[in-house]
Curated annotation (Swiss-Prot):
GO cellular component: cytosolic large ribosomal subunit
Organism listed in the record: Pseudomonas entomophila (strain L48)
Entry superkingdom: Bacteria
Protein name: Large ribosomal subunit protein bL28
Gene Ontology MF annotations: structural constituent of ribosome
Pfam families hit by this protein: Ribosomal_L28
UniProt keyword annotation of Zinc present: no
Gene this chain is encoded by: rpmB
Keyword Ribonucleoprotein assigned: yes
Length: 78
């Protein structure tokens, strides 16, 4: 399963670990993804999404119905 938020599309990015001696080694910065069940009143069921912390804030702000419309428009089966 890919490490991508279903709401924001955020995924891993790459960068460097930098030691005290300024040695650089490559690393990945992973998004803060959580599996979360959201109650969808219009469908009378739960929907399980893999969302980042920012994605949860977007759902709180816009509402789960509006976000699901965008996710389904993008082609994801939810």
């Amino acid at each position: 399963m890919s490490r991508v938020c279903q709401v924001t599309g955020k995924g891993p990015v790459t960068g460097n670990n930098i030691s005290h001696a300024n040695n650089k080694t490559r690393r990945r910065f992973l998004p803060n993804l959580q599996h979360h069940r959201f109650w969808v009143e219009s469908e009378n069921r739960f929907v399980r999404l893999r969302v980042s912390a920012k994605g949860m804030r977007i759902i709180d702000k816009r509402g789960i119905d509006a976000v699901l419309v965008d996710i389904r428009r993008a082609g994801a089966k939810v």
